């Protein structure tokens, strides 16, 4: 019996005939109810950071552009309560298996970048010792995506421990 990694309800693994024909072997790690709690970014979003429901460049991106920083992010999901809980459990409580939840989505999203060199966001040695894994490279591993660790990060105060204002003033530490 396989359980949802979020709510621990039993996962129903009924395969559909069409999945067998097209050899769709996407494994489910969370139940349908939990998956529905994650909101995909809609068609209307900031063209720079993918902030949902922004029809043009958002104020945050305008701020960074005025400072000479080009913003080009691509988000798949909104940062809602479900996503906040996901990151809390995945990053801060060390539930490494949760890296499998979005591996398939990441793999699909990165297909158009197959000629690129993927470089995961580094974490400090101290954070790696504490957590036991790098959250970005773990998802890439589960998605079977090749990457290069080209950067190292200095030991500094975690972004999650800073206020928004402090994060905006922070320079890059890798």
What residue spans do the PLM features occupy?
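Glycine-rich phosphate/pyrophosphate-handling loop used in enzymes and phosphotransfer proteins
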Residues: 1-174
């Amino acid at each position: 019996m396989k359980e949802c990694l979020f709510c621990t309800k039993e996962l129903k693994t009924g395969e559909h005939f069409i999945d067998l024909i097209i050899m769709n072997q996407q494994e489910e790690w969370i139940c349908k109810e939990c998956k529905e709690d994650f909101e995909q970014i809609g068609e209307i979003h900031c063209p720079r950071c993918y902030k949902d429901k922004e029809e043009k460049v958002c104020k945050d991106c305008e701020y960074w552009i005025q400072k000479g920083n080009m913003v080009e992010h691509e988000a798949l999901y909104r940062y809602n309560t479900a996503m906040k809980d996901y990151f809390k459990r995945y990053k801060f409580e060390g539930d490494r298996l949760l890296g499998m939840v979005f591996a398939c989505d990441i793999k699909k999203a990165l297909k158009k970048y197959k000629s690129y060199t993927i470089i995961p966001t580094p974490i400090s040695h101290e954070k790696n010792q504490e957590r036991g894994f790098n959250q970005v490279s773990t998802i890439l591993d589960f998605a079977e995506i090749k990457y290069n660790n080209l950067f190292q990060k200095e030991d500094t105060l975690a972004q999650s421990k800073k206020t928004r204002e402090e994060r905006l003033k922070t320079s890059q530490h890798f």
